[in-house]
Amino acid sequence: MIDIDWQTDERVAPCSGNFAKSFQATLGNGEIGLQNTDNGLDASRSFMVGVIDLTPADLHRMALLPTWNSIGLRLADGPNVAEAFAAGKHRDYRQQIDTATATLRTQYTLQLGGVALRVEVESWLSRSDRHLGMVRCRLTADQDCIVEAEVGVRANDTVARHPFRSLVWPHQDYPRLYGGGFYEKRMTYAWHPGHMDVVAVGGSAGEATWGAAAVAAHDGPAVGVAIAVGGDIAEVRDASDQSNARGIVSLRLPAGSTREIVLYAAFSREDRPPHLLKGALAAAQAARARGLESLYAEHAAVWAELWRGEVRIEGNAHLDRQARLDLFMLYQNAPVDHRYPMQIMGLAAPGYYGNVLWDVDCFSWLGLLPFAPDLAISTPLFRRRTLDQALLMATRSGHRGAYYPWQACPYAGEDNGPMAQHNRAIHMTFEVAQTMWLQWCAIGDRAFLRREAWPVMAAVADFACSRAVWVPWEGRYEYKEVIGPEEPFGVIDNDLHTAAMAQRILRLAVRAAEILGLGADPLWTAVADHMYLPRNPRTGFWQPHSGSEKPSPRRWTETTAYHLADLPASEAQLRDAMVPVGKGEVITDPEHNLPWNLCFHALAAARLGDEEAFALVLKRQSTIRVDPGTFGLRCEMAGNDAGPYITGCGSLLQGLLHGGTGLHWSEKGLTPRYSPCLPAGIERLTFTRLRWHDQDHAVTVDRRQGLCVETCD
């Protein structure tokens, strides 16, 4: 169904391996994330959702699991495969991600002395059983030989610690510690993964099974990881020590025949370490007993169901491929354990410490919602679960209600950012409340509205009132000393987007109370009705904040408010929002290297019916910070290549869906709000399955036939 063939891209050659400038592709199954390696065999970084290093002086960070996926090959008493590969002694290299089944395939031929060894590796994380992962290595030699493979579960090295909780962003400690070059150095210095201590190892050569139990630093969550080895094994011996459970397996390769090694990896959690280890070992052995083909068939069937919802674009092959790859990244990185949210850089990269920022609520989550509301629900449920933290944060700041942190730890929702001043970005709190409302719009479940959404929306409405300042001589409420979405403005008064979001949330809270038959605080309506939204007194246009009568240079503030806060905008205002596009800045300005803001320009162009501008912005969105050498994955900005930027994936999909179809969220699901607009050059835009109110819908925009929304069986 979907088989992206990357042979024509850079992946016919290995990446440089320089993680500071080029990140690797990732696999995910909603529970575990795994980075790939060039040769498919080396140990790579692996993470599990909600497993967090809780070291007190440091920031909480995603903890690196013990390594489990490596197969250290060598000819018996001969050359090492990894060393030969690194030395360039390979040919016919190819690496693919089969997006239909989230399977990474790597193949090449190595010259090891006088032996030509063909290596074919497949790696995948089970979607049908999220606690399983598989690696299969198939070997073919041109002459008789014996191959040895070191396998097992190993501890990772500890990392240097720094007192990030006491640092001040950005003008004091950071430049001193980094020696300048913040973006270039923060990835290795600040965004390293957290640590897990291996506390027990087990397994035996007799069972060809090895495992370890590990605890995230400072009494964090515990995990058991085990592998069972299958395939054409001739001999097994143990090589374990106190911190590493490992073995050496041997394969006899007759000339021209193919033999294989299979790693069946199992992960367990939520128990004491000895029980975790025992459970993981048993699960790995059970997976081996079931067999690779059976497990893969179940895994592929789950992916086939997910891919009933996809996007197809006729008339632009590049955009079609990038949109589907972006959707693939959202599917991979949406947690299936509903205690945990989506993370800004997904499950396999420690960028932003694994935190939850506004990017999740407004871009990646919102991009996934129409395709898979049952997966997307993990983020609003996380916001509900961490409401007590938000209530506490509001109290500590001297306000009523709930105040969500700018960077929330996915473990417990507490403030987990070094940028204390960014907690002035209170628009984040209002967007959390909107997340709850939009999830209800998607599923139409009043029980969810009452139990999950309402407590958050009511508490945020209280905060919106408490944080607003009444200015009696103006007869209005204002927001002083805030940071808006256009962060270069710094701390300002009366950010347009912040005020518009607050007004919207207050009115949505009143509406939610009406639906549920509950009482709404009259102050909510009073504050909403008297909220100050700054306008230019001469033009009547919205202005970005009260200290500037000029539009924002790139119109980020205004366009963000038009879409997220549903702020009314005249045709003249929308055309003004497109000025940066008309000037070509959307192509040439390095500040437009942030994929998220382009979403709003795309939507403004679509509302105007400007097909050429719409196409131009989408072209930029589908190419900016996209690395074909890592399967088209995105990074955030120049110098910040810490991992796949999931925000950009959701941003492109929102522009296509809401701009192309004109459909927007309402209490009835996705309903028409604006005329559909196909970008120039595109003949047909199809969403094969969008889901709202427990019903599947196929949505198509055709250049000749217009918009068609059909209910699916």
Language model segments and positions:
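Acidic/polar, glycine-enriched structural segments that form the non-catalytic walls/loops
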Residues: M1-Y352, D713
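Non-catalytic C-terminal accessory modules of carbohydrate-active enzymes
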Residues: G50-R118, E612-D713
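Carboxylate/His-rich catalytic cores and anion/metal-binding grooves
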Residues: S70, N80-A86, L319, A323-R324, ...
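The feature captures the catalytic groove of carbohydrate-active enzymes
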Residues: R269, A348-V356, A402-W454, D462-W524, ...
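Short coil/turn segments at secondary-structure boundaries
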Residues: L295-G309, I313-H318, D337-M345, T379-P380, ...
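Glycine-rich, acidic and aromatic/proline-enriched surface loops and short helix-turn segments
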Residues: L325-V336, R385, Q389-L392, Y403-C409, ...
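Glycine- and aromatic-rich loop/turn segments at beta-sheet edges
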Residues: V336-A349, L391-P405, S466-I483, Y532-P544, ...
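Active-site core of glycosidic bond-cleaving carbohydrate-active enzymes
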Residues: V356-L387, Q434, L438-A442, R451, ...
